[in-house]
Amino acid sequence: MTYEMPKLPYANNALEPVISQQTIDYHYGKHLQTYVNNLNSLVPGTEYEGKTVEAIVASAPDGAIFNNAGQVLNHTLYFLQFAPKPAKNEPAGKLGEAIKRDFGSFENFKKEFNAASVGLFGSGWAWLSVDKDGKLHITKEPNGSNPVRAGLKPLLGFDVWEHAYYLDYQNRRADHVNKLWEIIDWDVVEKRL
């Protein structure tokens, strides 16, 4: 199995001004491509050969294979959750109902998710995930980790590695996080539920 780059459903400049073309060019075109290339060179001849990225993340111990598989999975989910002009500015349907049930309101959820994103020390990810019973969880994952490792299904992820925002927001992580809400494609996120 060869791991491949996800195809972006938008042009590299389509998310401006939230995410600049320069950031997409580096973040997607260079960082993610490097993780994909690394994974393709690390996996052959190992017990992970032929496994999906999700299966590798769920079972691999810490190390190069896990780190690169985690970042391929994380970035694929991340880049595919955006749209230049999303149809909705908050989730509806089953996801909207689950957010209200588990967080009280969409605004409460955003507050908690922003706090997790901004409060993560160092590099990593904030995730909204669902467990096998349908309950939603917000988690902070360090480095290349993903909620799949804990048996959760990731729905929405914010990348808070500095490479995700430094060209556009410098050290203002909170500004980056607050702007991302403007480009979330809630239809894509809900389909992951």
Curated annotation (Swiss-Prot):
Q: GO cellular component annotations, sorted alphabetically? A: cytoplasm
- The identity of this protein, by name, is Superoxide dismutase [Fe]
Q: Where does Fe cation bind?
A: H27, H75, D159, H163
Q: Which GO terms describe its molecular function?
A: metal ion binding; superoxide dismutase activity
| Keyword check for Lyase | no
So which residues are the signal peptide here?
none
- What's the Enzyme Commission number for this chain? 1.15.1.1
Per the record, the gene is: sodB
Q: Which InterPro entries match?
A: Mn/Fe_SOD (IPR001189), Mn/Fe_SOD_BS (IPR019833), Mn/Fe_SOD_C (IPR019832), Mn/Fe_SOD_N (IPR019831), Mn/Fe_SOD_N_sf (IPR036324), SOD_C_sf (IPR036314)
- Kindly give the SUPFAM superfamilies that the UniProt entry links to this protein: Fe,Mn superoxide dismutase (SOD), C-terminal domain, Fe,Mn superoxide dismutase (SOD), N-terminal domain
Pfam families, A to Z: Sod_Fe_C (PF02777), Sod_Fe_N (PF00081)
Q: Which organism is it from?
A: Bacteroides fragilis (strain YCH46)
Question: Which free-text remark accompanies the cofactor?
Answer: Binds 1 Fe cation per subunit.
Q: State if Nucleus is listed as a keyword.
A: no
Which reaction is recorded as catalysed by this protein? 2 superoxide + 2 H(+) = H2O2 + O2
Requisite cofactors: Fe cation
UniProt function note = Destroys superoxide anion radicals which are normally produced within the cells and which are toxic to biological systems.
Gene3D superfamilies in the record, alphabetically?
Fe,Mn superoxide dismutase (SOD) domain, Iron/manganese superoxide dismutase, C-terminal domain
Keyword set for this entry?
A: Iron, Metal-binding, Oxidoreductase
Concerning its family, UniProt says: Belongs to the iron/manganese superoxide dismutase family.
Q: How does it assemble?
A: Homodimer.
